[in-house]
Each structure stands twice: as C-alpha cells, then as structure tokens.
Amino acid sequence: MKIDKITLCNLTSIEGEQTIDFTEEPLRSAGLFAITGDVGSGKSTILDAICLALYNRAPRFDNVERIPADDLKLVTDKAQQVQATNTASILRRGQKQGWVSVTFTTTKGHTYEATWSVRVKRSGTIASPERQLTQLAPEHQVVDKAQLQACIDEAVGLTYEQFTRTVILAQNSFANFLRAKQADKAALLEKLTGTEVYSAVSERIFRLAQQAEANVAALQSAMQ
C-alpha cells in the first residue's frame, strides 16, 4: 500500500484544512523526507490521523486513563468526562467539526479514499465519529459500511496492530516490534516481505514427508 495524499482539518494542533500530497512536487520525487517541527506542532497528529482514517484507532488513544474532558481537545462543556480512548477527543478545541482523508493505492493498483470525521451536535455533545471508504479506481464506488474495515484490512494487508508495529511507530513504541514474540515477529516479517509462501511450502513438504514415512512404515510392517 502506498499513501498518495493526506488531508486533515481541525485535529488537535492542526487548524483548518491542511494537505500533504505525495503525488506532487517536491514530495513526488523525494526518496526520503522528514516532517519536523516544535513539540505540539502536529507531527504525531498526522500519524494518528492516518490510523484513524484506516482503522478508527490511533496510538495516542491506546492504554490511557479516563481524564477530564477539559484536558482533551473537546469543544463542549456539557460532557463532564469522556474516555480518553474515545477518538472523538482529537477534535480541536473550539471547532465544530474535524476530519481526515487518506488516499492510497494498493499493490493491485486499486485506489481508495478513506475518511474519518467527527462533529459537535446541536446539543453541544460530540457525535460518534463517522467513516467512509470510496474506491476511486479502477471503478468509483462507495464501500458498504458493513464491509468497510474488512476491505481496508485486505487492501492495506495489515491489521491495526501490525500497522502500528511496522509502518507507523508512535513515540516510544519502536520497542513494540522488538518485544514481540518470536512467532509474531516472524509472521510480521513474512507478511511484509511476501515470503509467507515459503512457510506454506515448507509445511506442505513436512506433511508429505510425514505421510510418506507412515506409508513406508506400514509397508515394512506388512512385509514382516
């Protein structure tokens, strides 16, 4: 999967609509680049937004405690407390709506646009985030919501856990991959390098060898 474009609007420290287009210069021809800035300028927000669009989950919401709404980026005073794991808390303070759109192309050449959005209802409370997945090429069609996450998982080729251990590593999370169990680490590497086929072949050969040995043993027993 290759990310083509990211558009964010009113998410934490990112105010208004901002776009990062990897299909346009200077990023198009850049082999390697860095996103830099002061603490709190929105670098991690970009990574979180990508995860929200693809999985409705993000590293900043993992393993955190309940905290007062005022300490989150909420725009309402009516919600006394929310779960810090609630992805809606990424909405920038003072704004009525925020969203992210990620356009990406799969290894099969199919192009999709995944969007995630959140808004404030008339009552002043935060509405549940909304998601949409649209296939842009080779055909233009909106993916049924019931199939949305399964379609993204298949298109990306990674689950959220795998994605955040290999493609996007949150702050202080590089050790997650290193701490992974050997079997999990091997499975991840196989999936990323496309070599899982060799494990399947190896298992097939092993089963055939076992069957052949059993047949030989049966024949030897019959001849005695």
Language model region names:
Residues M1-A150, E154, Y160-Q162:
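Extreme N-terminal "head/tail" segments of very large remodeling/mechanoenzyme assemblies
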Residues A34, D38, N63-L72, H140-V143, ...:
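Extended, Lys/Glu-rich alpha-helical coiled-coil stalks
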